[in-house]
């Protein structure tokens, strides 16, 4: 199941009340409690607390996304020199745009779709991009034109992209 709508509804509710904490609870199982997500948008005065034992897992299913995803690393946009799918088309997994006082905390995991992790040698250039054209590349955490952003005590795993993108934040 796609847990994005439930998480987003909780964020929207907390923000409408003036702010607070949205808790993504974990458990003590070996792999943690999984929440499949596509694009979670933080709002003013909201902390997203991904607790220890919780895993926000990037959905591999295009049908879960609210937009048409682009696969792979590079895409073609006429007139643009370097076009990375995660930077110019696909939305970050967790993001904020022109928001203030947002936090992502809690000790949990943000787990992406890596490229090459299915290979024995997932480091060298020859195998690193194996499977890349078939993956939905997202930036795990992206904040744009925001103020007072805190990212602490979260673990980013198996990302195929920039881990954190902060643009014109103060």
Segments the model singles out, each with a brief description of its role:
Residues 1-170:
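Extracellular/periplasmic carbohydrate-active domains that bind, remodel
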